[in-house]
Amino acid sequence: MPIREDQVMASLVDFVLQACEGREFRILQLTDIQIIDPGQSRYPERINNITPISDEQLYADCFHYIKSTIEKAKPDLILMTGDNVYGEFDDSGASLRKLIAYMDSFQIPWAPVWGNHDNESTKGVAWQCEQFEKAQYCLFKRGNITG
């Protein structure tokens, strides 16, 4: 029995998104957010030599800009293209968990792409992948690609 094209495509696709009828599909790209928690820095003098910033203010500012941008763009999909969390400042994983919960709160599909700082947390890549895969609106599936 021949294999139909839609069966082949279904085996290659992890996620399918529906566009809103009557308007073009909108994708918002957020890049280099670099969420940090100065309280977790392995080298506290590095961040404090630049500027003394409170953890709460960093999150508030960053999340304010993310929310404002999402509200203006009204996207159907959000791509977060690298350096979402500065791993060296997130050895507990708290910043990544906050970011994931915040992104899920918009109830819009979103997908992270790894940057060169995302994998620096001592929690490790496998743990980070698990967090993304558990998120309700995150379109992430761990594969066998490394870089």
Give the predicted meaning of each segment:
Residues 2-17, 96-147:
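Extended active-site neighborhood of metal-dependent phosphoesterases/phosphodiesterases
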